[in-house]
Amino acid sequence: MLFDQIASNKRKTWILLLVFFLLLALVGYAVGYLFIRSGLGGLVIALIIGFIYALSMIFQSTEIVMSMNGAREVDEQTAPDLYHVVEDMALVAQIPMPRVFIIDDPALNAFATGSNPQNAAVAATSGLLAIMNREELEAVMGHEVSHIRNYDIRISTIAVALASAITMLSSMAGRMMWWGGAGRRRSDDDRDGNGLEIIMLVVSLLAIVLAPLAATLVQLAISRQREFLADASSVELTRNPQGMINALDKLDNSKPMSRHVDDASSALYINDPKKGGGFQKLFYTHPPISERIERLKHM
């Protein structure tokens, strides 16, 4: 059951990443069609930009993300309990010991980042360390170590980069349209254009406007799939499903983080740091904790 869930979530995540690349290609084609009279040229440029974004994030993610979240690095002397739990989980998972950080925040949360198991780090809030017992802390760190072992950290980083590239291209196109770039380039075509030309123009405009929203939803879907996988993988490491269930229950009752968490980092956390209601639920970076608990109960 556990390995079936892991395999299923991995397949779904790669499908979602493919959708990301298709969205990037669509925006690139639309921008190229509108502004340089070459949809294919725009597509190629967009894919190159996405590749550059992904590479830059992969090689710089750890320092950038930890700095953005106000995390401070600790060691065996300054945070022995957390350090030893992470060390134990890394040993069981057969990965190198990740760097360990603490975020001074009363909310209960944690995340992992990095480009690969050899260059990874985990962070936990001070609130989590104050509330969780040993078994629950092991479950949470097992969850984060699983993100590292399963290369979720790399996939999440690529997703952030591609979403940023799509948003950047759409924003650039919007500014160009504001200054009349598309109108000047296609004014003659539109004056005598046929139905197909008008349809292509409308579709291109819709792609530019809607692609960032679609990219956000795909990024959230990737995060949600990886959370299910990491929950299951944590149980595999600890052999203690009840510990994970108890930890999730405490996370569910935690308040939002007091410090500002940017959208790119939100998807990394074990618990959505920006809790809200109503329409905001559509943009939650995580599946409902009640659903995560139910899946664990039926493993």
Curated annotation (Swiss-Prot):
Enzyme class: hydrolase
Cofactor: Zn(2+)
Annotated TM spans: 15-35, 39-59, 158-178, 198-218
Main location: membrane
GO CC annotations, alphabetized: plasma membrane
Details of cofactor binding: Binds 1 zinc ion per subunit.
This protein's UniProt keywords: Cell membrane, Hydrolase, Membrane, Metal-binding, Metalloprotease, Protease, Transmembrane, Transmembrane helix, Zinc
KW Protease (keyword) present: yes
Active site: 144
Cleaved signal peptide residues: none
Family: Belongs to the peptidase M48B family.
Subcellular location: Cell membrane
Protein name listed in UniProt: Protease HtpX homolog
